[in-house]
């Protein structure tokens, strides 16, 4: 008995201690912070704690669907949206991202890994900010009471000025701009206190962190040591109370016995107990009844799970309406009580969920996963010799595989004519091309030119043969090349002397050599030049105003430097809010003086139009938050969860084709019943198909209805892209600082299919404005000089000035002449690099591009030609690139004449999920990129199949 009394007193004493000790921490329920005055008070507490508290904790319980995420908690400035402190969950890559304002005014980001939170299950997360007021704070992440990740020695947090408090705003997962895409059950912020006390609040033993167990043990020993004397006194007093209590209980037992005897005597005399109000049970079936003195003499307990009411009357709760527990597309059936979900919709697999109550419905939502129909052993039901492409919740049957002809309706049959030398319609140095409608055409191989039926040697690989060919169709590519050794895919010949301008030392035939002629393409023997630029009056579009760039935006023959209306929209430059972009309506929604047509932030004022990362989104509205990695930030992406860099939206409904189930909005679904739509991009609700070939009449020969027939259309499934054209391009300078700054000078020829760079320049890019998903990109590369030995190449998947892939080639080994910030050594040989620069343009990226190898936070070398051979002067090379960003497939081939000299093989990398194309130079002049060709292509090549299996097995 004395041992039990001692244990009780000890427990009582410990409870008193912890109750008093918990008073030096503050617990704030963030989900209840609503009205402005209350938010200001809470913000002031947080600001003070950041300056004075030892630790600050964010404790939350929530549930996220797979691969989803969002902002968990954020403290922002309403005035300029300054991010003082923010914690968000990036479910797609299993991490928690913490960002805060540093003392130097920059935002610092901390990635906490091993945060598997987006799996449809409920998790408790504790984020500990240790020593926020110290010079080097630390962050600890606990997931379900286990230590997941930690970072110490972080940059100090910037103190929040007191004047900012009234303008602070607290956003949680339920109220943030990027909302948590799940359910937040609780969210508290704890100011001060130790991990032991916070662990008691969250009922966590904190596995994996022995320091916390030690803290609890030490605290207990400290309590016993300090309170020993008081404990003895309290136990003595407690024993006296127990003795008195025992005597009182004995007296009560005697009195109860007397009362019981009296009642028994009354029953003998004829007195009977009153009838129970709970018999029969007046409550709802299954609800407990309890006798009470108040009217009506009973009280009913709570309604059973799944029902609601006062206990007497209970009605069913519709879990389907209140919790939405079923997967989209799966019907929710409400029962009495409870609910159940029907089977996952077609194209998905998962469990059939059933249960009772809203809490259960919210915590046990149905999860359905996509089925890869194409790997069912039956090619998804498509023709065995056709291409099957898996999509989310469905699949689509594509064209016949290479070497087969036909379609899904008629079947894909072997194309014997293209694989039998005795019957092939193509030249021996040509290959077959298979069009969408099943037709076959021929194309000469690399190093050969002609119409495909007849091919001849093409030394400079510009698409024109060295000798004229006897073609029956009078194809222009059968005419003799007017520059045999220098690529000129446009065959320009200003003086019509049969020698192309690219290799004619007097291109205009005026008797003055090109190197001395101030009008190379216009005869002007007098060489008159009224202004101070390098162009004579005969060819100067501003003869009296110096303008070496000769830019003419509206193409009216009058250069921008002297044109009063540069864009030709009828509004003078001085009054035009977009002087270089036609916009006769002058719409300016944000009233910043820059019209919407040329405003990089049309809904946010940014009169300076600064765009530090050259992604065409102004710095003011550039969030750099891109969940799917396709180069478009989530706020502007028409499919924010699916990579679609092209942003194609055929029906202009604001939903990209990649995530739109009815691309043309004609009421016929693209792939699922009552579809598939036989003209997916062109409205045809009647689905008329006169020849029964599976392709509707309205898109028979022009699938995207862009007035360019499919065999000539470089993107047959996009009405926005028809021909290869780099006439409109963006210049990106990768080293914008320096005393000897020389920017590239780009000259575009052949209607945008040829680019020449004339200057020995700093690193720079010429980037087209068309963004691609999957793409085939090829061109001829030629250095038309013998005076230099530096870099040239091309780029793809350009997203901004710090994120793109580049294929680059150096002629000889060389150490870069500026050793700051690090020594960079270039090796000869073709290189494929993934640029993911943290700093962006500047000396770090400049040296990283020059260097052959990996450079932290700048460039990763994905592949280099093992031959380690540089390019040769005045020699033409042809590259072929295949990029399928949806699976990370990259392959680069390089030809010298008809000979394949380099092949990267299959490279798997998903750093950039699509983007724009362009060309690259670094300290190399007189580069020609000729006969440029790109083509949209999302079909995954067959050599990816081994990697697909490895990806599914987690080995790549």
Curated annotation (Swiss-Prot):
Residues 555-568, 612-628, 650-667 have a biased composition (Acidic residues). GO terms for biological process: bone trabecula formation; cell-matrix adhesion; growth plate cartilage development; ossification involved in bone maturation. The keyword Heme does not apply. It holds the Pfam family TSP_3. TSP type-3 repeats lie at residues 457-491, 492-527, 528-550, 551-586, 587-609, 610-647, 648-687, 688-723. Oligomer; disulfide-linked. This is Thrombospondin-3.
């Amino acid at each position: 008995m004395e041992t039990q009394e001692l244990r009780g007193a000890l427990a009582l004493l410990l409870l008193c201690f912890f109750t008093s000790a918990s008073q030096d921490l503050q617990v704030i329920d963030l989900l209840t912070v609503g009205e402005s005055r209350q938010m200001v008070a809470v913000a002031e507490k947080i600001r003070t704690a950041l300056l004075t508290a030892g630790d600050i904790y964010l404790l939350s319980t929530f549930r996220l669907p797979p691969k989803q995420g969002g902002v968990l908690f954020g403290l922002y400035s309403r005035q300029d949206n300054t991010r003082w402190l923010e914690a968000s969950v990036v479910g797609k890559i299993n991490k928690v991202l913490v960002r805060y304002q540093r003392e130097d005014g920059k935002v610092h980001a901390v990635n906490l890994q091993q945060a598997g939170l987006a799996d449809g299950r409920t998790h408790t997360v504790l984020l500990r900010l240790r020593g926020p007021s110290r010079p080097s704070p630390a962050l600890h992440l606990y997931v379900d009471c286990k230590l997941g990740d930690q970072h110490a020695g972080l940059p100090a947090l910037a103190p929040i000025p007191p004047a900012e408090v009234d303008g602070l705003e607290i956003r949680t997962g339920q109220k943030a701009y990027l909302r948590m895409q799940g359910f937040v059950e609780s969210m508290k912020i704890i100011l001060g206190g130790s991990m032991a006390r916070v662990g008691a609040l969250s009922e966590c033993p904190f596995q994996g962190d022995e320091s916390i167990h030690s803290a609890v043990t030490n605290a207990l020993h400290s309590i016993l040591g300090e309170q020993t004397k008081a404990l003895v006194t309290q136990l003595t007093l407690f024993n006296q109370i127990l003795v008195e209590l025992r005597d009182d209980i004995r007296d009560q037992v005697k009195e109860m016995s007397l009362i019981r005897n009296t009642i028994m005597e009354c029953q003998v005399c004829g007195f009977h107990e009153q009838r129970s109000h709970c018999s029969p049970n007046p409550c709802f079936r299954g609800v407990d009844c309890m006798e009470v003195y108040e009217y009506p003499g009973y009280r009913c307990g709570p309604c059973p799970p799944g029902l609601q009411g006062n206990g007497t009357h209970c009605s069913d709760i519709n879990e389907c309406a209140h919790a939405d527990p079923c997967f989209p597309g799966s019907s929710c059936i409400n029962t009495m009580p409870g609910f159940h979900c029907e089977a996952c919709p077609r194209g998905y697999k998962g469990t059939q969920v059933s249960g009772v109550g809203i809490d259960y419905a919210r915590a046990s939502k149905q999860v359905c996963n996509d089925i890869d129909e194409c790997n069912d052993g039956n090619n998804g039901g498509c023709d065995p010799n056709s291409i099957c492409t898996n999509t989310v919740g469905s699949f689509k049957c594509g064209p016949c595989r290479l070497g087969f002809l036909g379609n899904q309706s008629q079947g894909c049959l072997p194309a014997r004519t293209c694989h039998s030398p005795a019957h092939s319609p193509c030249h021996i140095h040509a290959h077959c091309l298979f069009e969408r409608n099943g037709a076959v055409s021929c194309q000469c191989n690399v190093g050969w030119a002609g119409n495909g039926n007849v091919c001849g040697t093409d030394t400079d690989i510009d698409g024109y043969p060295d000798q004229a060919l006897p073609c029956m169709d009078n194809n222009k590519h059968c005419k003799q090349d007017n520059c045999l050794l220098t690529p000129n895919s446009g065959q320009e010949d200003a003086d019509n002397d049969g020698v192309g301008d690219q290799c004619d030392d007097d291109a205009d035939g005026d008797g003055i050599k090109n190197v001395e002629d101030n009008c190379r393409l216009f005869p002007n023997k007098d060489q008159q030049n009224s202004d101070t630029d390098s162009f004579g009056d005969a060819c100067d579009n501003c003869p009296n105003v110096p303008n070496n760039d000769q830019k003419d935006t509206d193409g009216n023959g009058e250069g921008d430097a002297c044109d009063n209306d540069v864009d030709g929209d009828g509004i003078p430059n001085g009054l035009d809010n977009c002087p270089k972009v036609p916009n006769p309506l002058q719409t300016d929604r944000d009233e910043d003086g820059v019209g919407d047509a040329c405003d990089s932030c049309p809904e946010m004022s940014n009169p300076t139009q600064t765009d530090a990362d050259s992604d065409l989104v102004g710095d003011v509205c550039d969030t750099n938050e891109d969940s799917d990695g396709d180069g478009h930030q989530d706020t502007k992406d028409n499919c924010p969860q699916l990579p679609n860099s092209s942003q194609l939206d055929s029906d202009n409904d604001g939903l990209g084709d990649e995530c739109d189930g009815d691309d043309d909005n004609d009421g016929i679904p693209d792939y699922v019943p009552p579809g598939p739509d036989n003209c997916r991009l062109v409205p045809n609700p009647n689905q008329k198909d006169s020849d029964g070939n599976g392709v509707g009449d309205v898109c028979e020969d022009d699938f995207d209805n862009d007035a360019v027939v499919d065999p000539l259309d470089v993107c047959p499934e996009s009405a926005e892209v028809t021909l290869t054209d780099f006439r409109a391009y963006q210049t990106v300078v990768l080293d914008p600082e320096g005393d000897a700054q020389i920017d590239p000078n780009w000259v575009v020829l052949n209607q945008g299919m040829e680019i020449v760079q004339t200057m020995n320049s700093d690193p720079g890019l010429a980037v087209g404005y068309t963004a691609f998903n999957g793409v085939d990109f090829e061109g001829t590369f030629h250095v038309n000089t013998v005076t230099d030995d530096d870099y040239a190449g091309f780029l793809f998947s350009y997203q901004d000035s710090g994120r793109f892939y580049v294929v680059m080639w150096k002629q000889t080994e060389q150490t870069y002449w500026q050793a700051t910030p690090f020594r960079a050594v270039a090796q000869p040989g073709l290189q494929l690099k993934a640029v993911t620069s943290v700093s962006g343009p500047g000396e770090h990226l400049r040296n990283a591009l020059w260097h052959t190898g990996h450079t932290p936070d700048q460039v990763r070398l994905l592949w280099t030609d093992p031959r380690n051979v540089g390019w040769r002067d005045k020699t033409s090379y042809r590259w072929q690139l295949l990029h399928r960003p949806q699976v990370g497939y990259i392959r680069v081939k390089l030809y010298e004449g008809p000979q394949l000299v380099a092949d990267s093989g299959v490279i798997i990398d998903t750093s950039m999920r699509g983007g724009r194309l362009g060309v690259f130079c670094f300290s190399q002049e007189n580069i020609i990129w000729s006969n440029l060709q790109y083509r949209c292509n999302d079909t995954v090549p067959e050599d990816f199949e081994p990697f697909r299996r490895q990806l599914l097995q987690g080995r790549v």
